[in-house]
Amino acid sequence: MLRFVVGTYTHLIYGVDADIERKKCKPLWLFEAHEGALTALAVDGIYLASTSSDETIKIFDHTRNVQIADVSVPTDIANACIRDMCFTKNHLLACHDNGQISMWSKGSWLLVHTLKSSSHKGITGIAVHPSEKLALTVGGDGKLRLWDLVRGKGGKVLPLSTIPESILFLNESSFVIMSRRGIDAFKLDLTSLFSFSSKSQLNALCLYQSKLIVGRDNGTVLVLDTSDGKILHEFTAHKKRVKSVYPVDDYLITASSDGSVCIWDKDWNLVIEHNIPEGNRITCMVAMLADSNSEPKNVEDEAAKRQSLDSETSETSSESESESEYYSTSKQPPVKRTKHA
């Protein structure tokens, strides 16, 4: 069973379980998660993080359908809208429109670092090295920046020939930078590996089956060789622009701005197509394996805490909803356990 979650321009998060064997999709939840358009999602284990133009981050346990944290960005950051974020082993990283990076400790959601740069044009993409000791970012100022994640400091700044949109590590020794019309691959010493240009605008990229997957404005998906950038395969995935591409298990999931989500096998055959409710334009997507038997650690203690909190809430409020009711009708999570700056 696969699970994908999309964020929309209309402030909504929509979660769906996809049964590959039966080729059926089961909607799990559709709710208003933020006060602005969703700009990024990130997933790691049980944690699902969402952010939007309202400059907040919310953390959900997607295995139990409950919000577990409401993380605010540092109060001294102006223009704090987040364009990209990702998890590492111990942290959640978020990139802001003012060129800064915030780091929170995973689990406690306490702010541990604010990495600052001289740029005020915004970071649009971040890639963390497999060692998790350094990160690379790109942004609206057309520069590549190196960050030391161990010491929490910025490093080298290098100008690029294009305005980049996204960045991705291919392995420990190479990475790719995507702009609207092309892709450039480099080694860590900045030796060029290959360059690829496209007539149609590029919107999304990921690694899948050791190949580079690129989603384009014309609805097509390109499969590129990571060694030389040559096109290995090309197929039409959607009628309109491909907004997101995401690998999970042996499958590739693509999402279009028109609200359609498609699951493809390793031979590029369409397995399942699902459409989110009409009028909700997709802005971002993540996917994961959905294991009905998986539970977070200390689940009994957490369940007891949640029951206690629910009891306290029922004593002070005349309105009460179960978690299942919330995920079909409510706009706010049933439980907000922590809030950190």
Curated annotation (Swiss-Prot):
Biased composition (Basic and acidic residues): 297-309
Annotated GO CC locations: nucleolus; nucleus; preribosome
GO biological process: maturation of LSU-rRNA from tricistronic rRNA transcript (SSU-rRNA, 5.8S rRNA, LSU-rRNA); regulation of actin cytoskeleton organization; regulation of microtubule cytoskeleton organization; ribosome biogenesis; signaling
WD repeats: 33-70, 77-114, 119-157, 197-234, 237-274
Keywords assigned by UniProt, alphabetized: Repeat, WD repeat
Entry-linked InterPro entries: PAK1-Kinase_Regulator (IPR051959), PQQ_b-propeller_rpt (IPR018391), WD40/YVTN_repeat-like_dom_sf (IPR015943), WD40_repeat_CS (IPR019775), WD40_repeat_dom_sf (IPR036322), WD40_rpt (IPR001680)
Region (Disordered): 293-341
PROSITE patterns with a match to the protein in the record: WD_REPEATS_1 (PS00678), WD_REPEATS_2 (PS50082), WD_REPEATS_REGION (PS50294)
Molecular function in Gene Ontology: protein kinase inhibitor activity
Main function: Negatively regulates pak1/shk1 kinase activity leading to proper execution of cytoskeletal remodeling and cytokinetic functions. Interacts with pak1/shk1.
Name this protein carries in UniProt: Shk1 kinase-binding protein 15
Gene source species: Schizosaccharomyces pombe (strain 972 / ATCC 24843) (Fission yeast)
